[in-house]
Amino acid sequence: MGALINNLLYLRYPTRHCTYKLAKFSTGCGLWQDVRMASGPGLPDSLVLEIFLHLPHKAVLSAGFTCRQWFAVSRDEFLWKELLYNYYCIPRSVPRHPAAVSWYREFKRLYDCIPCVEVQTLKEHHDQVLHLAFSHRGHRFSSCSKDCTVKLWDTERSDGTISLVHSSSMRQFNWGYTQFSQFNVDDTLLLVSGVYLGPHQSSSGEIAVISLENYTLLSRVRNKPYDVFGCWLNETHLISGNLHWIGNMTSCSVLWLNKAFQDIESENVNVVKRLFKIQNINASTIRTVMVAHCRRHDSPDLLLDYEAQSKAQAQQTQQHQPLFFDLGNTDSEEEEDEDKEDKEDEEDEERGEKRVSAHLPSFNPSGIQHVIHGRQSIAARERELETKVARLMGSRRTKAPDPNLVSPSAHGEGEDKTYLLFTTGSLTYSPHQIGIKRIMPDQMTTCGPVLGEERSTDEFFDSLDHVIDIHGHIIGMGLSPDHRYLYVNSRAWPAGCVISDPMSPPPIAEEIDLHVIDLKSLREERRSLRAHRAFTPNDECFFIFLDVSRDFVASGAEDKHGYIWDRHYNICLARLKHDDVVNSVAFSPADQELLLSASDDSTIKVWRSPRMVRLAEAPQRPPRARKLLSSLLGRRSANLNGKP
């Protein structure tokens, strides 16, 4: 590096009578060992700037302490703009963050304010840790684990460490493990979701509501399938799910609104109310429900793919249409008796097998393969026929959507909207679509009929207001703090794949894509993030929880790392190491420079930014002594007021 700078000086000023001696430059520590001028005037600012452009940012900061001139150049805006674009490999089409006041401070934010320094490891769990959730104030967080406990932790200790406050075991309720938790808006109640191990209910889950005042159990709610998870709608009401099979491949998902505690003042007050009934085809179900309170979208637009957006605006193309379509005419089917349908399907399958066995050839390998192929063909035809019947019957039994309920918000629109978001599917059982259903104000209470408003037989099912197809297996979702953007983890299907059998979804990629959906325009942004990996196949694929702060988005991965990206520049800023799969991450809502990560290695790691670590380790300054002049003035003032 020193030779490079000397060559630059010689080429730029070969005839000057002043010589500049640059001693050894240590790239490891990034410090100038000796920089002095033998004779002649100082270097011009333009030359110093050119030299600094060839140095790492640490060397620029160190060189800035040489003299006042170099310090001024080391804070040059053009210099730090170039350093930022080059260091993070950001495309030049991406502008500076709209909230940034300078390029120097923006570089400092990206480099020094990322929670990437491990400061504590929590080992109180004895099995895989599956989920983390902060309270809205950030003073506590909860953790769920396969050890079937939910634990509460305190983050406001005077020494800056995190300590365990409370632990509740859910095995007494016949749970297999806890998988998800969420604080209500005022941080007085905790929703805990787990997998219930009751008889013949392998897919069933349960939701428990715990008071954070005295840690008592307030209520328990059935939740099927268990990966609906559940969520809060407001301070006192939560949403759960139930599933009714009406065929081998067709089912009905019912979403319920539940009071968080049993009302004992009157037996006439409802504690539950049905929100929606939605038809599922091709063995798909509704999962991962969450509520987005979109309050007028006053936040600025988060531009993610600047080149694509500029081209789209110039050409006014319709590239987003495949990702933004209406399911108002979704085919659905009338619900019938589940046991009766199962028996009829079993009898049909037995008759099909008998027809095949009647034409069974001699027992040789080719004959066996022919029989197996015949059975598979019959099963596939039966599934295809069931789907066609479900679509036909459902088209006559689904409530028509109101196009005004969910529509892209116009600029300056003042109406608040509440959306119910969930994963679903239409082609196969693996979740590959985001369903959006608006919740109206009169639906946010359990008052009124338990089964909701009266409807005719032609309105048996509720239609989805909008669906966004991700074209891959969805393994995680998270909302931005302002609830405008939905971030989705998915593993993509091969391009151009065709699904002929809903029970055999396409193979999924090892890379995890992180998509961003703008709930204002109801579109998926074209540019997705890809840096983390997963390796499990379709039938073993599990949920990877992600979290979003004001400036960053973080996610776990199966490659034993957590990842942090910048939301504006779409760049990966840090990798957080664990000894096994990272299942969940969580930013503190009070301080985005504090991050938690949970792993299959049974630990929770606490990460803070380099800036916060330095502040915590810096010795506290002693109180400043009162100056003599201020002391004399204080005494004089006291004497004037008549005090001795």
Language model region names:
Residues 24-119, 148:
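Skp1-binding F-box subdomain of Cullin-RING ligase substrate receptors
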Residues 60, 138-142, 188-191, 236-240, ...:
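Structural hallmark of WD40 beta-propellers
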Residues 105-127, 161-169, 453-467, 525-535:
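A short helix->beta-strand "capping" segment at the edge of beta-propeller domains
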Residues 127-133, 172-182, 226-231, 473-477, ...:
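Canonical WD40 repeat/beta-propeller blade segments in eukaryotic WD-repeat proteins
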Residues 132, 150-155, 201-213, 249-258, ...:
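WD40-repeat beta-propellers
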Residues 132-139, 183-186, 231-236, 469, ...:
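Loop/turn segments within WD40 beta-propeller blades
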Residues 144-147, 490-491, 556-559, 598-601:
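Conserved strand-to-loop turn within each blade of WD40 beta-propeller repeats
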Residues 219, 225-230, 243-475, 498-515, ...:
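Terminal intrinsically disordered, low-complexity extensions flanking WD-repeat/beta-propeller proteins
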